[in-house]
Amino acid sequence: MMKDYEVLKKYFGYESFREGQQELITNILERHDVLGIMPTGAGKSICYQVPAVMLEGITLVISPLISLMKDQVGTLNEAGIRAAYLNSSLSYAQYRKALSLARGYTYKIIYVAPERLMSDEFLSFAKEMKISMVCVDEAHCVSQWGQDFRPHYLHIREFLKEMPQRPIVSAFTATAT
């Protein structure tokens, strides 16, 4: 198995980790839940993308913005990491095709909107797959008190309880207080 710094170099082109990244990655690889609060531009995404490549199974990334999902998936696929997104921008046929490919473990990382988590079809898919990690990107959206709050984030806990084996949970934000 590749080491974390080898994954960093091969897929992201960096020689070394930034401050705080390796500690978060190590904790994830040791199967600990983590919360990463890092400034914008500090490399939060690498903190879950590197372990996602190294862990067996699929990493689900709960993300609030379709544009962010598309950007991340495009960047990952260009780097050679198979990734997809499941959100309202897909037609039903595209969604079904993406799920079918995911069932074959085509993807290491799948970005999903929080509204999708408890849908019957997605929940059924998630239960039959090996979900190694669930990552909450832009985790400040979980807070009921914030202006960015999305009620469906409250279903993450319920979603995790539905999994046959509890995945690692990671959450990242630049704006938690």
Identify the role of each PLM range.
Residues 42, 49, 90-133, 141-147:
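Conserved helix/coil segment N-terminal to the catalytic DExD/H
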Residues 1-39:
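Conserved pre-motif I regulatory segment
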Residues 120, 127-177:
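Post-DEXD/H (motif II) to motif III coupling segment of the RecA-like Helicase ATP-binding lobe
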Residues 36, 61, 84, 110-112, ...:
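Hydrophobic positions in the central parallel beta-sheet of the AAA+
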Residues 52-54, 76-78, 100-105, 124-129, ...:
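Conserved catalytic network of the ASCE P-loop NTPase/AAA+ motor domain
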Residues 31-50, 60-63, 172-175:
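Walker A/P-loop
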Residues 30-36, 57-58, 106-108, 168:
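Pre-Walker A (Motif I) flank of P-loop NTPase domains
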Residues 57-79, 88-90, 94, 113, ...:
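Conserved Walker A/P-loop ATP-binding site and its immediately adjacent core
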